[in-house]
Amino acid sequence: MDTPRLHPETIAAVKERADIVDIVSEQVVLKKRGKDFVGLCPFHDDKSPSFTVSPAKQFYYCFSCGAGGNPIKFLMELGKQSFSEVVLDLAKRYQVPVRTLEVQQHQELQRQLSRRERLYEVLAVATQFYEQSLRRPEGAAALDYLRRSRQLQESTIQKFQLGYAPAQWASLATHLIEQKRFPADLVEEAGLVVARRNGQGYYDRFRDRLMIPIHDLQGRVVGFGGRTLTGEEPKYLNSPETTLFEKGKLLFGLDKARAAIAKQDQAVVVEGYFDVIALHAAGIDHAVASLGTALSRQQVKLLSRYSESNQIVLNFDADRAGAKAAERAIGEVEDLAYQGQVQLRVLNLPGGKDADEYLQRHSVADYRELLARSPLWLDWQIDQLLRDRNLDQADQFQAVVQAIVQLLGKLPNTPLRTHYVHQVAERLSQGEARTAVQLASDLRAQVRGQRWHGQASRWEKPGDVSIREQAEAQILKVYLHCPRLRLAVRKTLHDREIQGFSLQPHRLLWQAIAEIEEAHLGFAAMYQVERGEGNGDDLAAIDLVPILRDRLDQLTGVSLGGFLELSENDHADLTHPLPLLRGAVALVERLRCEKRCRHLLDSWARQSIHTFEHCIEQLLQAGIGEDVDAEAQITALHEQLNQEALHFQKLYYNERRYLQQLDQERCLNPQAFLGMTEHDATAIAPTTPQPISA
């Protein structure tokens, strides 16, 4: 039987999931050497380790026989298999769905590939048009802006192919469709023109804007960013998502920066196009920018191909908006950072300036010095938590401690946790040595109690995910379809310390909602809203459903059907939205609480319990004077020896009391909990250890 033609998406998915070390180590004994692995080459009679495997580059190479390639090539050469056979085997191994091409599908794919080439051609011609327009009289103001306001040299303008979109409604449309004879639907597909509502022709998407081409890794133009020159909103307008232009998979400037990233073993990620352009002009050419979105895991992995140490510096603005962008970026790759798979640092420039503004007033050496001193992401986050806090006020002190405990509880490395516990204790004690010692002890105990977060799935029952999915969906439906309750939802989540949603589709939808609201309300108002404060009327006035419907193509990985179009049952439930909301939130919190209980119960059960008899025996061996209060000494020793077990016992019973409180709230709205059985609601763990007592 012939091996079927595989769909390109299947091949791409296999390449993304296949790990070179995982595959090679099954055939070759590998030893760690620096960032790479070495072993005896399987392709020739190797006497000394000349075979190198690079996890960062997903590549192997033998310095003796010259064999080299990616994971697929390794298996093809070793097993003498065809490309398709290896890909099929890997697809089964990594559980990648296999799609194949029939003859007709193969022909359609060839047609699509041909159309892609035409799209590249259209975008290249558009780039030339914008570049030429910059040199014409109508582009004089844009050129003056680049030279005077941005202080760019001619070589930099040409390097980045900067241009100008004329103010006329259809200058580019006329040039491409009528003069260059490109099909109108092709030009529209490239994101350059928009069809008129009356169906009579097209108008230019970009008008009277400074044009910044966005390139892929091969240096081909795939989209544009257009900056207004008149104060018109939005300040920056990007190309829409197209076949070629996917914002989450691209980084502005990477085509020009990748060699420098490999040389410097570091990538600098900034916020704006002109930050990248200014840094490259100053000789700091290992800088890139995300395209108006938080840095994604995929973008981080893209950068990791070029940096052996996977070192990434986030250089975002030092204002609150920049800090929020940095926090979003950290959130996307936090697990990679905790595991040490990426060395993440954060650089905030003084005075709240971006890189472009800073370089206009300071030297390149100043910037490089700040770059070299940029703190690790965890140090930066701790700094953010302590900034502008009055630690003499109990509520602020408690809030800081709780947030820091959550951060440190996720660290898998015990020595590193100890380092940060002592460092934070020193800062919280404000120079008081005795207080620092006590704080370090308290923090260590609290962090130990938080360690279950890193192993969440271990403490989760099989049915928890589906129950949580129902509850989170109900919260989102209330938020979307009951606008008067939006501030109440925000306040409830904030007060319960529920940081967003657990399931990825819900997180993406919540993030999209927040971006829409921030665009309407502004950052300052949105900051209050996220804390459950501010004006609920302004929040309620935003018509989220149609806006989200228009953004369907941008929300990959989210099925919005059940959120935007309500069923009859949904309509019935939402006739009493407030009890529904309270019940759903209580259920989300209950699931978290149950998980904590299971963890604490397990930790408690694993402690060695020392009896009073054991304590008496120890004291007798040590010798007790006649004038000593023996009962007090026995009690003190009992508490000392059982300190850990008593700690977990106390935490466990606190959680059980909280569960009872949540169950009372749950009774307000039974229909929010139809997915929860009586057993789910009561069974926390098989057996509760006996309390430690006399």
Swiss-Prot record:
Changing C597S: Cell contains less chromosomes than the equivalent wild-type, but grows at the same rate. Its EC number is 2.7.7.101. One of its GO terms (molecular function) is DNA binding. Keywords: DNA replication, DNA-binding, DNA-directed RNA polymerase, Magnesium, Metal-binding, Nucleotidyltransferase, Primosome, Transcription, Transferase, Zinc, Zinc-finger. GO terms for biological process: DNA replication, synthesis of primer. Residues 265-348 form the Toprim domain. Its cofactor is Zn(2+); Mg(2+). It comes from the Bacteria. It catalyses: ssDNA + n NTP = ssDNA/pppN(pN)n-1 hybrid + (n-1) diphosphate. GO terms for cellular component: cytoplasm; DNA-directed RNA polymerase complex; primosome complex. Mg(2+) 1 binds at E271, D317. A zinc finger (CHC2-type) spans 41-65. Mg(2+) 2 binds at D317, D319. Belongs to the DnaG primase family. HAMAP family: DNA_primase_DnaG. RNA polymerase that catalyzes the synthesis of short RNA molecules used as primers for DNA polymerase during DNA replication. Monomer. Interacts with DnaB. Contains an N-terminal zinc-binding domain, a central core domain that contains the primase activity, and a C-terminal DnaB-binding domain. This is DNA primase. It comes from Synechococcus elongatus (strain ATCC 33912 / PCC 7942 / FACHB-805) (Anacystis nidulans R2).
